[in-house]
Amino acid sequence: MLKDLYKTQIVPSLQNKLGYSNVMQVPKIVKVCLNMGLGIRGSDSKVMNSCVRDLALIAGQKPVATSVKKSIAGFKIRKGFPIGCKVTLRNNKMYEFLERLIYVVLPREQDFKGLSINQFDGCGNISIGIKEHISFLEVDYDKIDKILGLDINIVTNAVNNKDAKLLLMEFGLPFIN
């Protein structure tokens, strides 16, 4: 499991590579946030229910429905309009999800060559977009109404992008350069 790998191999390795004197200075993954945005399709309760069901299967816990905070006439949306769903994973469920992401989902993703350094936000967090949520084995292809995208945000406590990239490379995430 990735949690055991982190404690036994990744922490000592990163401590040597980054030159930290204390184990607590080594960066770690704090949480993983999953988000499915539906846009205007969120008004259809059938699509919204399937989105919540699929994200619950993928994450292993119940997602929260997100709604519009401010009305925008140009986008034809009103305040309180359902627009997607999200879930935050921590601790054991986070490591289980990362293991499935690294070893199952990313290899199944079409045209995936690796992650780019441009996907980092400057503070050590990375955002990954999955074009088709059917890449996850938990989602039954026969029961889905529509193929949706999925946003994955991996939040670390790393000081900069370089440290976060080293951490994620130790976990096995593939990078282009």
Swiss-Prot record:
GO terms for molecular function: rRNA binding; structural constituent of ribosome; tRNA binding. InterPro entries: Ribosomal_uL5, Ribosomal_uL5_bac-type, Ribosomal_uL5_C, Ribosomal_uL5_dom_sf, Ribosomal_uL5_N. Keywords: Ribonucleoprotein, Ribosomal protein, RNA-binding, rRNA-binding, tRNA-binding. It comes from the Bacteria. GO terms for cellular component: ribonucleoprotein complex; ribosome. Signal peptide: none annotated. GO terms for biological process: translation. The keyword Ribosomal protein applies. Belongs to the universal ribosomal protein uL5 family. Part of the 50S ribosomal subunit; part of the 5S rRNA/L5/L18/L25 subcomplex. Contacts the 5S rRNA and the P site tRNA. Forms a bridge to the 30S subunit in the 70S ribosome. This is one of the proteins that bind and probably mediate the attachment of the 5S RNA into the large ribosomal subunit, where it forms part of the central protuberance. In the 70S ribosome it contacts protein S13 of the 30S subunit (bridge B1b), connecting the 2 subunits; this bridge is implicated in subunit movement. Contacts the P site tRNA; the 5S rRNA and some of its associated proteins might help stabilize positioning of ribosome-bound tRNAs. This is Large ribosomal subunit protein uL5. It comes from Ehrlichia ruminantium (strain Welgevonden). The lineage of its organism: Bacteria, Pseudomonadati, Pseudomonadota, Alphaproteobacteria, Rickettsiales.
